[in-house]
Each structure stands twice: as structure tokens, then as C-alpha cells.
Amino acid sequence: HYKDYKINIVDTPGHADFGGEVERILKMVNGVLLLVDAAEGPMPQTRFVLQKALELGHKVIVVVNKIDRLDARVEEVMDEVLELLLDLNATDEQFESPTLFCSARQGIASYSPNETGVNLDPLFDTIVNYIPAPEGDPTAPMQMLVSSIDYNDYVGRIGIGRVERGTVRVNQEVAICDYHDPSHSAKGKIVALYEFDGLGKNPIQEAGAGEIVAFSGMADITIGRTICAPEQVEPLPFVKISDPTIEMTFSVNDSPFAGKEGKYVTSRNLRDRLQRELLKDVSLHVTEQGTDAFNVAGRGEMHISILIETMRREGYEFQVSTPRVLTKVIDGKVCEPIERMVADVPEASMGSVIEKMGRRKGDLLSMNPVGSRY
């Protein structure tokens, strides 16, 4: 909350394993903060997410952070940001985006690198004045796209999304539909409604068009479903959740060192934890393999490795197999997943990239110069 405004700030992942998630989150917002380190400059993931934001026509505010670093090179980083916007074919308005200079650790922001800020008011003022308010008729029939899910032991699965139009209320009867599955039709009820306040959630009675809210009461709600007023069922388009591409087997640790590191070592502990993860991660697939082993399929190595590390830190002890690529039989042929990779590199790096992709059975489909890069 800032003055008379409520500002929703949503973070996005940058890794390709979560590419669909980036696009779903960007559809919930009206503008973006392009956060750039004053020493490191724009990173590869910065380019990936910014390109998606520009394609959606979002307004951009450039924020150069960590200006208090000893190795800060603010002027050079600003030039790199402008080159990035130019390379990504930004519109004239996006190219003239306002720029702020911050130190998040000190909680200060200023309009010039030569000024020393006092607080973050310049950043919030720029957001209020430059980013458009969400559009949507609060009197129209309610419509909301579920862009993310969460899970709570007390209320079960929680849907998160932005109200596109109308007003959503507690105890409201709703229809649930799916853009990619016209045959899916169900009814539900909003049992509880929450607004986001900082990192927490506060219960509310109703929310209007443009609000980002969380709701509970529908056990099988998932990403991509549209919640509508029953009198006007109209699904919203969304980016489909990617199918799993690799699989690993999680099993009980039966090595000579079993039971020495973790607190939770039995197959029942492992099963319960994986079932809990399925409630909040819709792109994970788990199948039982005998009594002590589980096949866990995900979107990529990073996706599964994050789960493994999280469970290890929680005190679970288990062993994992090497990753296996998942294949599909399409029209009688066995097909393996492929990744369409777009590398944006300086001319000097082209040879190294082509060589490394060749080792992974990569086929070069096209090579186009964009400015001084390929």
C-alpha cells in the first residue's frame, strides 16, 4: 500500500524449466520493473523475461539496483540496457522508459545516479504515474483465470489469479471451465477469499476487477482453469503446462549408510512428502514403482533437482536414479522430447555455441544477425 494506492508486485522465475510460468505471471500484471545489477548488468534470464514482457506490450520501468557497490558501473550498465531494448525491438515508448537508481539494501531510490535517495518514494511514485491501472468492468459477470496454485494443510488447495472483470465474493457459486478442454465443466463455491499483503495473506469478503486474490474451496482447482459467473461461462486462453521431459526414481536408501543423515527414511515418509508436493506443483508427475520406489517426472533437470534439495533440507533421506528421457509413441514412431533453443550471442561466441549444441545432437535451423549479435 502506498498513499491511496495498492500496488501488486509479482516475482517471475527466469529459468527455461519454468518458461510457461513466466508467461502466465506476466499476464497478471500491467507493467514490469526491469531490475538490473549496477555491476553485472543485464543477465541472460533478464533478456528472456523482458522479451516476453515487451511482446505483451507492457510498460517498463528500468531499475538499476546496488548502486552502492564498489564495482558499480552505472553508465555502462545503462548503455547495455538501452542496447538490450534496441535488440528486442522495443517500441519508442518502451525505449524511452523511465529509469531509477536504487540500493534495495539501504531502502533508497533516486531519479539520477548523482543524487542520494532518502527512501523508496521515487520508485512508488513512478509506478503510480507510469504503469496503467488494471482495466475491467466491476459490474460485469465475474471472470478470473487461475495463474498459480498454493496449498495449505488447513484449507487445502488454494487458487491464485487476477479478477479480469466483475466482483468475486465469499460464498459465491461459480462455474469452472477450461479454454483447452471445452468438455470440462464443473461448479464450485468460493469458501474463503484472501488479498496479498506483503508476503502474507489477509481474508477479505470481496474483490473487484484488477485485484490479484487467492481463494479456497475447490479441491481440484488447477492452473489454467477459468472461474466465471454461472450465467456467463467464458474461458480465458492461457499457456498450457508443459509435459514432463525427464524422469528419476526416488527410492528408500538401502545403502550401508542408511539412516545416518535424515529423520524421514521410510517409504511411507517418502510417499506422503511426494503426495504433498503434487498438491502445489501441477507439472510434477509421480507414479509408484513397487513398494519402496517412486518414479518422479518433471520438466527438466533443474525442476527435479530443486525438489531433491528441498526434501534433503527438510530431513528426508532417499536415493535417486540417473535421469531418464521420457519418450512418446506418435503415429507409430517413438519420439523423444526436443528443446527449441534460441541463443542470442555476440559474433565471437557463435562457434562455441554451435560446437556445444552439436555435441547434444542439435540441428541448426537458422542464423539471423540482429545488430552486432546473432
Q: Where in this protein do the model-derived segments appear?
A:
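Conserved Switch II/interswitch segment of TRAFAC-class P-loop GTPases
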Residues: Y5-I7, T12-G19, L26-L50, L54-E76
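Alpha-helical scaffold elements adjacent to nucleotide-binding pockets in ATP/GTP-utilizing enzyme cores
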Residues: E21-R24, M28, Q45-K52, E76-L84, ...
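Residue-level signature of catalytic and energy-coupling elements of molecular machines
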Residues: I9-D11, I25, L33, T46, ...
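Switch/connector loops and helix/strand junctions flanking conserved nucleotide-binding motifs
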Residues: D17, M43-P44, R69-E75, G107-S112, ...
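Canonical P-loop GTPase G-domain recognition
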Residues: K59, D68-P132
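Conserved short loop/turn motifs at secondary-structure junctions
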Residues: V63-D71, Q106-I108, S112-E115, E164, ...
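P-loop NTPase nucleotide-binding/switch module
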Residues: H1-R24, L86-A90, F95, C102-G107, ...
